[in-house]
Structures are given as structure tokens and as C-alpha cells.
Amino acid sequence: MSETILEVHHLGKSFGSHEILRDIDFVVRPGDVTCIIGPSGSGKSTLLRCMNLLEVPSSGEIRYHDADIMDKQMNVPEYRSRVGMVFQSFNLFNNMTVLKNCTVGQEKVLKKSKEEAEKNAMMYLEKVGMAPYINAKPKQLSGGQKQRVAIARALAMEPEILLFDEPTSALDPQMVGEVLEVMRKLAKDGLTTVSYTHLTLP
């Protein structure tokens, strides 16, 4: 059996008296493409946010290469660079160009030089078909283009796992296909992913 990257054990999450997650268990291994399926309001997004430490679990544990991610010794920014996340609402910096959106995290968190960060960003922007738009601002892009930039930004941090939090929910139907195509290519390339989406990847 191959080494696990992430292990979720007996995970629970409550907001006040409202229980969202109860006793969740699963493991993620290199190359896995994991899809979280369930009705609206069942806690799928909350689960991904717990895995990225945007929410702190109420009980249970999440282990990354056997290290407890809730341990006080855990370097959270570094962990988040290894377990990246693509959000429903893109979360791009509207005052920055496409290229800058994809380099700022590398420079701040990974301490890469501007030149190295730009070279790396360009590689991933080309991968998602957004290299021609490096000088554009997010407001000049379609929803599908914004999400492809968000994916490139996450990839530029060179994550071991990429979490997709309903990446197509904010898109017009005609834009969904281009984002799903990028996700299919990433899966074929062997990137480990965990996705919450109402759509399947044929």
C-alpha cells in the first residue's frame, strides 16, 4: 500500500450547537482523485476548509505525512502551500495583474525571487491557457478565465494536494467546460486532488 499524504480520523465540526460534520474518516494517497459527494448543506465545503485549516475541527484529527496539522508546532502558511485550495469565488486580488496574482504567494511564503516566481507562474499560466492575459486585471476576465488563473496560482505554489471547493458553481454554464477540462488534465498528469463539485469529470 502506498504512503498516505493526508489522513482524516473521526473528524467533527460544529458551529455552536449545530453539528456539521460527524466522525469523518478517509485517506488521500499520491495520485488519488477524490470526490466528495452529498446534498447541499451536508458539510462538504466545511470539510475542505478544515483540511486547509481555514476552519478548525471541533474533534478528531487530520494528519499530513503523519504530522498532526493542528499541532501548535505546525507551520500553517507552509502547510497551506503544500495543500492548496481553489475557491468557488476565485479570491483573486483585483488590484493585481494576472501574473502578480500568481507570484505574490511564491515570493511571500516560499521566499522565491521575483524572477523565479514569474518563471514558475508563466509555466502554470501556459498550462491553463492564460499566458496571453498576464497583464490583465481580474475585472477584465470572464468567470472561467478567473478560475483558470486561480488554479494556476494554486499550482504555482507547487502543492502536493489541491483542494477544489465547488470550482464551477460561480460560472455561467458555457464557462464550466473550460475549467473542467483543466481539472481533467491535472488528474491525468497525476496531481492529487480532492474535489467538492456537483459535476463529474468524464
Show which residues each predicted segment covers:
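ABC family nucleotide-binding domain
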Residues: 3-199
